[in-house]
Amino acid sequence: MCIRDRFEYWAHEACFVPIEDYGLYRHRMLDPAAMGWKYSVKWMAEQGDAVASVLEHIRANGAARSADFERTDGKAGGWWSWKPEKRSLEVLFTSGVLMIAKRHQFQRYYDLAERILPGWHDGLLPPEDQVRRRLLLASVKALGLARAGWISDYFRTKQSRASLAHDLQALVDEGALLRCAVAGWSDAVYVHAEHGELLRAAAAGKLAPTLTTILSPFDPVVWDRRRALELFDFDYRLECYTPAEKRRYGYFTLPILRRGALVGRLDAKAHRAQGRFEIKSLALEEGVRVSPRLVQDVAGAVRRLALWHACPQVEIAQAQPAAFGALLAAALHDGGAAARQAA
């Protein structure tokens, strides 16, 4: 999607990106073969005529959806069973020939990049070292506190350890990054210079996180599973790809962030037609102490999530520990007073 201030592309993953950052991602479009499954050199070689036909259709008729092309391979559709025309649209998108003009009910409308971004030409392309610098600084700033091994994952940049170490040292030398130490860690961590005051406040024990919320599995807090484990001691995986009999927590578990700590996870389903939000399972992390404040914090977060799904009624099918589930159910069924207060 591209509307005034943002466009859609592969950044962290599929993301909405500020339009002023288009040049930072143009390098990827010019070398799409380096982007793994998102682009297929083989497809372009074997299906060149079909790809050209899809492109010509859009050039002549304007923005189009995958649904506007009749499936020609005779196969049944499916979530990941893309028809040839959809695959052609995607390789043209990844290579920057097409952009996403808009979305309607989750369907992408593809159009020519020159029609969506007429002011762009590759003479505006920033040098690669400048792109690398800007993405590195943006990564550290977004992460807050970053080990070197966490940085490249944020924007899926591909950089050798030696090259990254060189760039980090250069940014420290010029004062753009601060190098720090964390008790118990042998390696250095990096903080953006603009966060210097926050860093000093944190070191002095003057920062007190207050937010409690339910995270998406794709939230940057937990997206890098290694970082979530190292920083929060939170071992997380999305189990929708795990056979049902091997799942530990549920099909689509959502992490619970509470006052700066990941304290648990829940698997929920919104039954919107009945206005019912079902917590199929909920589990606190080992060592989390149950307290009235914890109960009210989590109840507030669950209530907000349920109401966002237009489900005023919340039910808890299973919780671990069970006593916490009972306390949470009571807090949720008090008319929402505690949850509204927490909000």
Q: Language model features by range: what are they?
A:
Residues R4-A343:
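Long, charged, low-complexity, helical-prone intrinsically disordered regions
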